[in-house]
């Protein structure tokens, strides 16, 4: 989110909610939006193929056909340009490529947009008028925008709308995605994506790879390390396996790639792809063929039947640490009960696995000096040690510590 939830609720004069059933999926923020409409008279526009709860409070409901988000947004921006409601000063001072952008938008006149989306021409004009004349307006979206094959383009088009209107960098404006689960933001911040290290430092960057290689004690790419397998036989490990130069696979790529022989093992943590990913029959077929599957979970799932190894994790009530919420607020949590049975916190399981892998390596790969490689050993005593590493290597988390969060 470019603006905080309090900022949006207290300063926005208009709200555009698209692809988000906010009161159901984000009830706290949804309640804040409803209060803003009822108590401050904020103008609310909802764009959703369904009639959701927020529609009861909306000035307009744009009930467009599924998958026509870009056409809808381009059509609205056509009208904004036609009526001269764009923020010319903001565009001149802060935007690039306006002529190319305008040429694209002008391909979506209201009649064509209405035909594509199913939204009447009159409703399009009323929505564009609110957007163009009531400032500032906050744009809010969730999985209904991102979970598409054109999800990135959907988001870029929403950003174009806000730049066209000059609603960026102001209280009550901005582009505000609501994340799908409570710590999705934190997982992404920590590099839980195929193309970045923690804090969105690109894996394709020589500088970023060198930074993490030094901190984690990994050699340069042209150096090799020896390892021994369980029978004591030597084999060669290329350190680029740990510091990749190329962007990795997404979830929707790695599982189908099993059938193509490109994925041989899966380590799944807190996820049930059989139920969550599209085409369940295809996912089952892939998991039946994978050479090795490790599943780290807190309860049996549809995916459990395909696991070669099951590792018992813990629930939120059994672990301490931090969550980063949708507005990037870092919050401390403390365990309420001790882990049950053989279950362990996820960080302990991961660290123990890493230590056992590192035990197979020689110093040709791993620097043992704490000065040259301060985070090479996975020797964490608590989650506060992990946070210390995070704020040392992830600039956006610099200065954050458990001690400060406790205050």
At which residue positions do the language-model features occur?
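Conserved N-terminal structural segment that caps and organizes enzyme catalytic cores in eukaryotes
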Residues: 191-192
């Amino acid at each position: 989110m470019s603006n905080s939830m309090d900022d949006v609720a207290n300063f926005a004069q208009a709200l555009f909610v698209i692809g988000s059933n906010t009161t159901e999926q984000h009830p706290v923020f949804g309640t804040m939006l409803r209060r803003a409409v009822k108590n401050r008279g904020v103008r609310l526009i909802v764009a959703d193929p369904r009639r959701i709860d927020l529609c009861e409070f909306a000035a307009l409901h744009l009930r467009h056909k599924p998958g026509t988000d870009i056409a809808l947004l381009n059509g609205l921006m056509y009208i904004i340009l036609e009526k001269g409601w764009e923020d010319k000063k903001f565009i001149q001072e802060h935007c690039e490529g306006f002529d190319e952008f305008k040429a694209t938008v002008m391909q979506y006149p209201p009649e064509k947009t209405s035909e594509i989306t199913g939204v009447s021409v009159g409703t399009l004009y009323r929505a564009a008028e609110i957007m163009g004349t009531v400032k500032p307006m906050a744009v809010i979206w969730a999985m209904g925008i991102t979970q598409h094959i054109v999800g990135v383009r959907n988001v870029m088009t929403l950003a174009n709308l806000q730049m066209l209107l000059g609603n960026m960098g102001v209280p009550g404006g901005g582009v505000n995605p609501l994340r799908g689960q409570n710590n999705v933001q934190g997982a992404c911040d920590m590099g839980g994506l195929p193309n970045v290290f923690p804090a969105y430092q690109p894996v394709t960057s020589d500088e970023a790879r060198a930074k993490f290689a030094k901190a984690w004690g990994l050699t340069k790419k042209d150096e090799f390390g020896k390892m021994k397998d369980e029978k004591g036989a030597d084999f060669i490990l290329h350190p680029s396996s740990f510091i990749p130069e190329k962007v990795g696979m997404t979830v929707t790529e790695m599982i189908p790639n099993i059938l193509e022989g490109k994925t041989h093992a899966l380590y799944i943590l807190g996820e049930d792809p059989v139920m969550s990913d599209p085409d369940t029959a295809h996912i089952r077929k892939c998991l039946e063929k994978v050479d090795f599957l490790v599943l780290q979970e807190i309860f049996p799932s549809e995916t459990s039947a395909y696991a070669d190894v099951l590792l018992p994790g813990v629930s939120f009530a059994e672990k301490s640490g931090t969550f980063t919420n949708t507005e990037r607020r870092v919050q401390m949590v403390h365990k309420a009960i001790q882990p049950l049975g053989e279950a362990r916190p996820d960080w302990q399981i991961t660290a123990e696995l890493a230590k056992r892998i590192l035990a197979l390596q020689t110093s040709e790969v791993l620097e043992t000096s704490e000065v040259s490689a301060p985070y090479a050993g996975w020797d964490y005593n608590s989650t506060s040690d992990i946070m210390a590493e995070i704020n040392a290597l992830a600039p956006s988390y610099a200065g954050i510590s458990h001690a400060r969060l406790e205050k």
